[in-house]
Amino acid sequence: MQSFFTQWISRWIFSTNHKDIGTLYLIFGAFSGVLGGCMSMLIRMELAQPSNHLLLGNHQIYNVLITAHAFLMIFFMVMPVMIGGFGNWLVPIMIGSPDMAFPRLNNISFWLLPPSLCLLLMSALVEVGVGTGWTVYPPLSSIQSHSGGAVDLAIFSLHISGASSILGAVNFISTILNMRSPGQSMYRIPLFVWSILVTAFLLLLAVPVLAGAITMLLTDRNFNTSFFDASGGGDPILYQHLFWFFGHPEVYILILPGFGMISHIVSTFSRKPVFGYIGMVYAMVSIGVLGFIVWAHHMYTVGLDVDTRAYFTAATMIIAVPTGIKIFSWIATIWEGSIHLKTPMLFAIGFIFLFTIGGLTGIVLANSGLDISLHDTYYVVAHFHYVLSMGAVFAIFAGFYYWFGKITGLQYPETLGQIHFWSTFIGVNLTFMPMHFLGLAGMPRRIPDYPDAYAGWNLIASYGSYIALFSTLFFFYIVFVSLTSNNPCTNFPWEFNKSKTYGVSTLEWIVTSPPAYHTFEEMPLIYETKSN
């Protein structure tokens, strides 16, 4: 018994194996996603009808729920699953490396997250919680308005989570730049690896700015400085500039790994190489660069000069160009392909469709004149949930079904996966499509009560969220069924046409399912073959 326990501790607590750490990230992300999902359910139940009922008129609690929902979903669900989970599992295998460059750094990157999560949950439970929204703007987050320790706990939580992200980013950058197998140039690495590389650079540059901003907020609250306190000569708008200089690259950090995953899936299920590989790479890099010079489009209403607003409007619209290149390249990949509509492909097509809608509403919001009336309405909520709740999350589901057999060695039941896709698709669209109409009608964000005129669309949105909830529960049932069924997965489960053998484009389909504890006993040699 003792030896089993020590083995378990050394394997899972002191792990230096990229696959085990990736598994830990996936489990952690699923747990946090459930917590965040419960909070969104509470929000939608409160908003199902006008007037106060579920939260008994306690508007502070409502804002605490919204803040915690955002932090959980962004920092503890999407980032750990995409970068930590899929990134750790797949990047070393795809580049033919035995492990990450710094395996123990990888371990601490993960183990910083559970304490960070605990601090975040504590911040919601002490005093009156953090009712500031995820942006934590002063003066609402100042010591006068949030006098308890809740905001300080949230700040510490973000510090630790940010440290985890930076360490992980350093690890990915050095792994991808230094540990590729012989014959694998940068222009031969898979698009998912490129997406993780760009994401890691974004993290490395953006997160320290957030750390600086929240550290100044911490000293404003506790040590009598006045960085953001106008009465002491500070400027609360400075905080907004610092926060959004991090916050805008952050949304690209959330979606870029998804772009990489979708490229692989669309290519596999269309039986074609990705259309315009080099263009895809340059598009991702340009999105990463442009993401840093558009931050003030979140701040059109704070009184920026008109020429400043004109610049940020133009720059924001330019980002649509590389994004459009990616979308049209995916469509060109599907075009004339031999399409197989398995669950990962359904989620990928859903991703392309819904992400495009989210991108179009983003173009609308880029206009500073229009944004004055749409700012802080449900139109903005609809926009970023189309990009995140149907972009990032659909990419996660697509990647999960695509690589599930490879990671576990067991294949999921296809019919159940398709039911999960359709129920999720209907649920999220029913939830977020009405929010566009509410926003155009002027319903403000972060307010738990609303005039009766908005009741109809809100009820529909709440019903949609209940459908999405049940489809998520169904997803966990699928995972349970898959893991308990004895349905082994072949090395390459997506071989549909047995008579003609296709080459596989990436290394993970060459190794066994699941891969050995040490994937490569010797370095693979990568070279190009001419296709007939």
Swiss-Prot record:
Fe(II)-heme a binds at residues 69, 385. One of its GO terms (molecular function) is cytochrome-c oxidase activity. It is an enzyme of class 7 (translocase). Its EC number is 7.1.1.9. SUPFAM superfamilies: Cytochrome c oxidase subunit I-like. Cu cation binds at residues 248, 297-298. One of its GO terms (cellular component) is mitochondrial inner membrane. Ca(2+) binds at residues 46, 448. The keyword Electron transport applies. O2 binds at residue 252. Coiled coil: none annotated. It comes from the Eukaryota. PROSITE patterns: COX1 (PS50855), COX1_CUB (PS00077). Keywords: Calcium, Copper, Electron transport, Heme, Iron, Magnesium, Membrane, Metal-binding, Mitochondrion, Mitochondrion inner membrane, Respiratory chain, Translocase, Transmembrane, Transmembrane helix, Transport. Binds 2 heme A groups non-covalently per subunit. Binds a copper B center. Pfam families: COX1. It catalyses: 4 Fe(II)-[cytochrome c] + O2 + 8 H(+)(in) = 4 Fe(III)-[cytochrome c] + 2 H2O + 4 H(+)(out). It is found in: Mitochondrion inner membrane. Component of the cytochrome c oxidase (complex IV, CIV), a multisubunit enzyme composed of a catalytic core of 3 subunits and several supernumerary subunits. The complex exists as a monomer or a dimer and forms supercomplexes (SCs) in the inner mitochondrial membrane with ubiquinol-cytochrome c oxidoreductase (cytochrome b-c1 complex, complex III, CIII). Component of the cytochrome c oxidase, the last enzyme in the mitochondrial electron transport chain which drives oxidative phosphorylation. The respiratory chain contains 3 multisubunit complexes succinate dehydrogenase (complex II, CII), ubiquinol-cytochrome c oxidoreductase (cytochrome b-c1 complex, complex III, CIII) and cytochrome c oxidase (complex IV, CIV), that cooperate to transfer electrons derived from NADH and succinate to molecular oxygen, creating an electrochemical gradient over the inner membrane that drives transmembrane transport and the ATP synthase. Belongs to the heme-copper respiratory oxidase family. This is Cytochrome c oxidase subunit 1. It comes from Chondrus crispus. The lineage of its organism: Eukaryota, Rhodophyta, Florideophyceae, Rhodymeniophycidae, Gigartinales.
